[in-house]
Amino acid sequence: MRVLGIETSCDETGIAVYDDELGLLSHTLYSQVKLHADYGGVVPELASRDHVRKIVPLIRQALKDANTEMADLDGIAYTKGPGLIGALLVGACVGRSLAFAWDKPAIGVHHMEGHLLAPMLEDDAPEFPFVALLVSGGHSMLVKVDGIGRYEVLGESVDDAAGEAFDKTAKLMGLDYPGGPRLAKLAAKGLPAGYKFPRPMTDRPGLDFSFSGLKTFTANTIAAEPDDEQTRANIARAFEEAVVDTLAIKCRRALKQTGYNRLVIAGGVSANTRLRETLAEMMNSLGGQVFYPRGEFCTDNGAMIAFAGLQRLKAGQHEDLAVKGQPRWPLDTLPPVA
């Protein structure tokens, strides 16, 4: 089976072609970072308009790169949600229209399921069951995964997600958009400076996350300290360590609760070097395994949508003719794949 994947949930237009026998045949991506940089964040209306401009040329390029004609496709997968409704509808309209015109089945994919399954694109793909840590700009959650569509959300953000906390803290430090990667780069220059940042919600049972208080603590620390480059780097390091430690503590709890020894990290924040190193050390000490996608598949992309959609299309699942976008969509409401 060969599937065209379309991702437009936020500020990246991602198109890919995936074949269940040959693997990933093509992967094209357009990022709107420069478009939104002047505003310090994603402007939904501008994002939607840019998706409209870029999506068809990218589809043509992806099909050309994959040496694939319309007749070679067995289905089309597009991101249905969660995300920005205008951006979602661009991908949904184009995907559903192509499916109708080409007489192909179509499937609306859950964006976070795409991230969750992204490590399956690697040669050392994880086997079920495992615990997944999904960390991005809009989501932080721990999921018990027993199979595709067999998900139990063990804990999630009650306010700011980890990626959102990175971006907002970067803005407090005067760093340019996108803030998260820039903050991590600054943190790499930091030194242990005796800051005692809190590890939110680790002093109580449970697997939920909360990073808004940590962001406020960081803002107060910035205001109280000298405004020089090394001090800012030290604060960035202390903030990053607090976020990473919090995520690691919760992951350890989730593994103990489930009895599983495999951990998947996915989503934009999974590209963070300190997070990868910390969780790799933790899993090594526990005698377990950790899996994550390559860097280009940590952020939003069409490859993960093509792969996730193919799994459901193979199981006979598909959408009706209606064009739908779901800006809010609980992961654990998805049907299982038999």
UniProtKB/Swiss-Prot annotation:
EC code(s) of this entry: 2.3.1.234
Assigned GO CC terms: cytoplasm
Residues the entry annotates as binding substrate: 134-138, 167, 180, 272
CDD domains linked to this entry: ASKHA_NBD_TsaD_bac (cd24133)
GO molecular function, one term: N(6)-L-threonylcarbamoyladenine synthase activity
Cellular compartment(s): Cytoplasm
Gene Ontology biological process: tRNA threonylcarbamoyladenosine modification
Superkingdom of origin: Bacteria
InterPro entries given in the database record: ATPase_NBD, Gcp-like_dom, KAE1/TsaD, Peptidase_M22_CS, TsaD
Major site of localization recorded for this protein: cytoplasm
Cofactor(s) needed for function: Fe(2+)
Positions of Fe cation binding: 111, 115, 300
Cofactor: binding details: Binds 1 Fe(2+) ion per subunit.
Pfam families: TsaD
UniProt-listed Gene3D superfamilies: 3.30.420.40
Disulfide cross-links: none
Alphabetic keyword roster: Acyltransferase, Cytoplasm, Iron, Metal-binding, Transferase, tRNA processing
Catalyzed reactions: L-threonylcarbamoyladenylate + adenosine(37) in tRNA = N(6)-L-threonylcarbamoyladenosine(37) in tRNA + AMP + H(+)
Alphabetical list of SUPFAM superfamilies matching this protein: Actin-like ATPase domain
Protein family membership: Belongs to the KAE1 / TsaD family.
Chain's role: Required for the formation of a threonylcarbamoyl group on adenosine at position 37 (t(6)A37) in tRNAs that read codons beginning with adenine. Is involved in the transfer of the threonylcarbamoyl moiety of threonylcarbamoyl-AMP (TC-AMP) to the N6 group of A37, together with TsaE and TsaB. TsaD likely plays a direct catalytic role in this reaction.
Name the UniProt record assigns to this protein: tRNA N6-adenosine threonylcarbamoyltransferase
Organism: Shewanella baltica (strain OS185)
Gene: tsaD
